[in-house]
Amino acid sequence: MAKDDYYELLGVQKGASEEELKKAYRKKAVQYHPDKNPGNKEAEEMFKKISHAYEVLKDPEKRAAYDRYGPAAFEGAGAGAGMGGMRGGGGFHDPFDIFREVFGQQGGMGGGIFEEMFGGGRGGGGQDGADLRYDLEITLEEAARGAEKEISFRKLVACERCDGSGAEPGSKRVTCPTCRGAGQVRRSGGIITFTQTCPTCGGMGTKIEKPCTVCHGEGRVRRTTKLNVRIPPGVDNGSRLRSSGNGEAGVAGGQNGDLYIVISVQEHELFERQGDDLFCEIPIKFTLATLGGTIEVPTLFGKASLKIPVGTQSGTTFRLRDKGMPSLRGGRQGDQLVRVHVEVPQSLTPEQRKILEDFARVSGDASEPTSRSFFEKAKKFF
């Protein structure tokens, strides 16, 4: 290692800036990292060399000594060794420590650098919390007008004692001694070398010196949580409302999960929903159906006037514009469809009976049904 030119190892000029050194080291470290070159001793040795070279050149004092005396200033100095020919120096670090320092992973590769090396993510960072589902039943009135509901549910939250770290106050997380912070370890199966999640740290890259006495190192505890949920007008059965970050807490810096509120609308005693339209049936007196008039009908937004034309038949459907459900996606509000059912009196007073008999006598043939299509079609059955 002492005979190598440190600048050449990193591929930079002698006057390279600190940022240029760091950029060059990142590129070389990714190229020669042992995890990217399993079983390749030459790559592993080169990884150690470039790590040692970078550690020397990034330190102004060590770099000055190297520029003056060359590699001889550090003869015998390697990963974990003393400074050798340089007086007053401290020891060198493990090459993996240098790697973690540069890539800022607090004890392991993860996120962007691992994706850069292998095209995917892995352990060494926090674990995201799970998403949760809450089934919420509301009335049709609440679905039409919108509402605000308070819900209560149990979930994993960050431990109050350790603030989610899993470590007892005064203790801390340290680099996992098994995987050296990588979150994975290499295993050999005959001629095949493969990686697997570190059994010591579970892929976190760190372990806890002294677990928290409340959460026992989990970093999370189960608690009952209350949350106010705003329900927008127009929701329907199966509508999902997302409450970002209100799922279960992440572990070791991982993001919280989300909470999904799934809506269920109760059946209504009067209205039936058909998309954004509402349907209802109302009874009217046969005198109103015959003579016509105006009545008030209920809607989800109050009363509305409905004009009944003269001679309205039972089963006739009327449309009240914009009295249906609001559209969840915006746009025009639905309508309310009103089907009338003409009620025939089941009992009559003597006076009422006489009036109807007089009506039947003076009507003659005019009392026959005005719509004869059904009877014409039914003749062949008699």
From Swiss-Prot:
Compartments where found: Cytoplasm
Entry's Gene Ontology molecular function annotations: ATP binding; heat shock protein binding; unfolded protein binding; zinc ion binding
Cofactor, how bound (note): Binds 2 Zn(2+) ions per monomer.
Start-end of CR-type zinc fingers: 146-224
UniProt domain J: residue ranges: 5-70
A GO BP entry: response to heat
GO cellular component: cytoplasm
Pfam families reported in the protein's UniProt record: DnaJ, DnaJ_C, DnaJ_CXXCXGXG
Main location: cytoplasm
InterPro entries per the UniProt record, alphabetical: DnaJ, DnaJ_C, DnaJ_domain, DnaJ_domain_CS, HSP40/DnaJ_pept-bd, HSP_DnaJ_Cys-rich_dom, HSP_DnaJ_Cys-rich_dom_sf, J_dom_sf
Binding-site positions, Zn(2+) 1: C159, C162, C212, C215
CXXCXGXG motif repeat segments: 159-166, 176-183, 198-205, 212-219
Residues binding Zn(2+) 2: C176, C179, C198, C201
Function: Participates actively in the response to hyperosmotic and heat shock by preventing the aggregation of stress-denatured proteins and by disaggregating proteins, also in an autonomous, DnaK-independent fashion. Unfolded proteins bind initially to DnaJ; upon interaction with the DnaJ-bound protein, DnaK hydrolyzes its bound ATP, resulting in the formation of a stable complex. GrpE releases ADP from DnaK; ATP binding to DnaK triggers the release of the substrate protein, thus completing the reaction cycle.
Family: Belongs to the DnaJ family.
Complex and partners: Homodimer.
Domain comment in the entry: The J domain is necessary and sufficient to stimulate DnaK ATPase activity. Zinc center 1 plays an important role in the autonomous, DnaK-independent chaperone activity of DnaJ. Zinc center 2 is essential for interaction with DnaK and for DnaJ activity.
Protein name per the record: Chaperone protein DnaJ
Organism: Opitutus terrae (strain DSM 11246 / JCM 15787 / PB90-1)
